[in-house]
């Protein structure tokens, strides 16, 4: 049996408001649970696929700076 994690995550948050999405992200990060990481990855994939080149560059700069801390 195969489980489509990406599809499950997207189905779970599809139609959510910005506030609901923020709550989902904050809860996942604050919980610190490893099992939440794939879901955050799926959400990041959506952000990345919908970002223009300037937004991608800004995200990469933010990531690079965050990893230097």
UniProtKB/Swiss-Prot annotation:
Induction: Expressed only in the forespore compartment of sporulating cells. It comes from the Bacteria. GO terms for biological process: asexual sporulation; sporulation resulting in formation of a cellular spore. It is found in: Spore core. Keywords: Sporulation. Its main location: other. It holds the Pfam family SSPI. HAMAP family: SspI. Belongs to the SspI family. This is Small, acid-soluble spore protein I. It comes from Bacillus cereus (strain ATCC 14579 / DSM 31 / CCUG 7414 / JCM 2152 / NBRC 15305 / NCIMB 9373 / NCTC 2599 / NRRL B-3711).
